[in-house]
Regions:
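Short alpha-helix
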Residues: 153-169
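Class I SAM-dependent methyltransferase SAM/SAH-binding core
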Residues: 38, 44-86
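Conserved Class I S-adenosyl-L-methionine
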Residues: 174-258
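A conserved beta-strand element that flanks and buttresses the S-adenosyl-L-methionine
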Residues: 98
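Short catalytic micro-motifs in class I SAM-dependent methyltransferases
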Residues: 101-102
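Conserved class I S-adenosyl-L-methionine
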Residues: 1-38, 46-50, 67-70, 125-156, 186-187, ...
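A short glycine-rich, Lys/Arg-flanked "PGG" loop and its adjoining helix->strand segment in the class I
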Residues: 110-123
Length: 258
């Protein structure tokens, strides 16, 4: 939680829900006929708010007061101070659960998954996460190489996570790749895959947890190199084809258990 108390002060400014991610959530939830959703590690509640606007009742669980204090209120959202590993909710308190780029921050993700299963029973679980096997192919690591170690040490492999969810739930588990739009509005780590200039913006970097864990010297050197490569045209020479693409598979995945 200390990490998100540190980076969370301006989190809501850059980490806004993206409609394409939200619509994919709606599509996945539609088959479950759930009406009450628990959003675990809800942050500032951007996706809780998105679902509430579409008629869902949402229980948003978030341990960081810094995050909760930035949340936009909604009559269909109930905010709860709590940790994923010990959810302050009764058995079958919700019919489905979402975990949006939060699982890798849980102290004990396996205990958290057991708690999720307790709270939703046989209901649907949707995890939005990242495939750590993809990180070495992302050009951003050429400027900030510590991203590789951070991602590989914090994200769980997709196959392992899928197998663990299946073992806990007994439900079918589907992995759905999410191709990140070039104009993503939720500024998580891959927001600038086709817009490298975004990473020069301190506000963007401040909303990305991986940057908070990188040494300041590496960040300064990486930003300087990226700025120089953009000014000289070197970045466009090597990666400029990305600017022409509307979507790109950087490695983000929805894991759906139903």
């Amino acid at each position: 939680m200390a990490l998100y108390d540190k980076i969370g002060k301006t989190y809501a400014q850059t980490r806004k829900s993206d409609s394409r991610i939200g619509k994919k959530l709606l599509e996945l939830l539609e088959s479950s006929q759930a009406r009450t959703i628990v959003d675990i590690g809800a942050g500032t509640g951007s996706y809780a708010f998105f679902l509430a606007e579409y008629g869902y009742n949402v229980i948003a669980v978030e341990p960081s007061a810094t995050m909760r204090n930035q949340a936009i209120s909604h009559p269909a959202i109930e905010w709860i101070d709590g940790y994923a590993e010990n959810l302050p909710l009764g058995d079958r308190a919700a019919e489905a659960a979402i975990i949006m780029l939060a699982l890798h921050h849980f102290q004990d993700y396996q205990q958290a998954l057991r708690e999720v299963c307790r709270v939703v029973g046989k209901g649907q679980i949707i995890v939005f996460t990242y495939d750590p096997a993809m990180i070495t192919g992302f050009w951003l690591t050429k400027y900030f190489p510590s991203l590789i170690d951070d991602v590989e040490s914090t994200f769980i492999s997709i196959s392992k996570l899928s197998n663990e969810i299946y073992a806990l739930t007994g439900n079918s588990v589907n992995v759905i790749p999410f191709r990140v739009p070039h104009n993503l509005s939720d500024s998580f780590a891959a927001v600038g895959w086709a817009r490298p200039e975004l990473y020069l913006d301190r506000n963007i970097r401040n909303g990305i947890s991986s940057f908070a864990k990188i040494d300041n010297d590496e960040i300064e050197q990486g930003v300087l190199r990226l700025q120089q490569d953009l000014e000289t045209g070197r970045w466009d020479k090597e990666y400029g084809n990305l600017r022409k693409q509307k979507q790109y598979d950087v490695g983000y995945r929805f894991i759906q258990s139903r």
